[in-house]
Regions:
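Transmembrane-helix signature of polytopic, membrane-embedded enzymes
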Residues: 104-121
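Membrane-interfacial loop-to-transmembrane alpha-helix junctions, especially the N-terminal start
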Residues: 24-28, 253-264, 306-314
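Membrane-interface alpha helices of multi-pass inner-membrane proteins
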Residues: 154-178, 194, 268-272
Length: 343
């Protein structure tokens, strides 16, 4: 019931944001505060909460654990100044959500819609569990502007810094390649991925991972190697949109627009190959996050008489996905909601 009320309030806030420029700023501020408080004041929420809490309690300079250095030393600093684990959760919630908000403000043609997608497509809730990775992605996304400006050294340094929180962020180094506008190249990549939706290539990929690899344990864990039915269901709409944009590719005439289109096509191809296998899906997060920028961009480009139909169909898809993943499946332990305020 909490998350039903939550998404209802979000809808009201974001709809009111359409009415007036001042109301837009106020609504977005309220939205940001609300998502920070819900994420930051959570308690025992998410499948990894207890694990991260145990790591935090036992973390010391003598026991540095297996964590990436960025996340490790930030937490050591928090412990040094006497912060509880719950306080660290709140601080990371601020950092993650503010950085995602700034990213959306910079690149989205409709900030309210992108924020709604941030929730409905589960990225907000994913950050309850994959804390390190989502902090890294949030930092990385705010450095993409340097790739647009061809300041590749700065882009490289920010990517490396982001990867100090989760090494999978290094795959984001591919982003500058997506500035190459070759329709046929992306079409071939996408078409080549289609057979993997039904072919069991995922198990072969997992078995090729060497045991010496730092994250090899993730590729042998049942949880990470099982197929997510929600992720498979989610393949339908993105693949339909790839067909649509490959036909209308010429309307995306700006450099930033083409980059987000290209990243989206690549992320869909990656998702097709992953076919819902959790560990492979996580590798795709750094690309797949592009969809919260991409969908509003596409809606803004289609013809006026088609816009209401496409918009309502997308809204229905996003709501169904939210209901299925959060309200029904619990989004990996975020349901029911518990807060440190009610201990």
């Amino acid at each position: 019931m909490f998350y039903v009320c939550f998404i209802g309030i979000v809808f009201c806030i974001l709809i009111s944001a359409k009415l007036d420029a001042l109301l837009l700023r106020v609504s977005l501020f309220i939205f940001l505060i609300m998502i920070i408080l819900i994420a930051g004041l959570r308690y025992q929420i998410g499948t990894d909460y207890a694990t991260y809490r145990e790591i935090y309690i036992n973390l010391s300079f003598d026991n540095l654990s297996y964590l990436e250095p960025g996340y490790r030393y930030v937490n050591l600093f928090f412990k040094y100044i006497g912060l509880s684990y719950e306080a660290s959760v709140f601080i990371f919630a601020i950092i993650t959500n503010v950085l995602f908000y700034l990213f959306i403000r910079r690149y989205s043609v409709s900030v309210p819609v992108s924020l709604l997608l941030y929730l409905c497509l589960n990225y907000y809730f994913i950050a309850f569990n994959t804390v390190r990775q989502m902090i890294g992605i949030a930092i990385f996304l705010n450095g993409i502007d340097y790739a647009f400006k061809k300041k590749y050294l700065y882009f490289f340094l920010i990517t490396v810094f982001a990867a100090l929180f989760h090494y999978t962020i290094f795959i984001g180094m591919l982003y500058p390649i997506f500035k190459i506008n070759r329709k046929r190249m992306y079409m071939i990549i996408w078409l080549a991925s289609i057979p993997f939706i039904v072919l069991p290539i995922q198990n072969i990929i997992i078995k090729l991972i060497p045991a010496s690899f730092k994250y090899a344990s993730y590729f042998t864990s049942f949880f990470f190697t099982k197929t997510s039915s929600a992720a498979v269901f989610k393949l339908i709409v993105p693949n339909m949109f790839v067909i649509l944009i490959l036909y209308y590719i010429s309307v995306f005439d700006k450099t930033t627009e083409r980059l987000w289109v290209n990243v989206f096509i690549f992320s869909v191809a990656f998702a097709n190959i992953a076919h819902g296998v959790n560990v492979l899906i996580r590798l795709n997060y750094v690309f797949q996050i592009s969809e919260i920028i991409f969908y509003p961009l596409v809606v803004s480009k289609i013809q006026k008489f088609q816009k209401p139909i496409v918009s309502w169909l997308l809204l229905g898809y996003f709501v169904v996905f939210y209901i299925f993943t959060v309200l029904v499946q619990g989004a990996q332990g975020v349901v029911p909601y518990q807060s440190v305020l009610f201990l």
